[in-house]
Amino acid sequence: MAEGKFATSVTCMDGRIQLPLAKWIKENYSVDYVDAITEPGIDKKVAENNELDSIKTKVGISINAHKSQLIVVSGHYDCAGNPVSDEEHISQIKKDVDVISSWNT
């Protein structure tokens, strides 16, 4: 069993956002660690229910093994895996919240 308080970040693999996002999550949600689940353009994949088995399994591990009680879903500007407008990223992230909430892992 892992020690400390965990959160889960479902985010793009882009290295420009991972450290700043983990820092923001730690500072704003008082967690010690952030499990990072990454794929290129992950906000689009989840919104479109595309190749979700691996993502769902990893979220389940974070929740069950690390007792994560917070899942943060993100997208970002200039994403090579999902080059869409900010508005589209926001729309996809809103869908992602519904999809991930339905998993009950």
Language model segments and positions:
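Short, well-ordered beta-to-alpha junction loops that form the rim of enzyme active sites
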Residues: 76
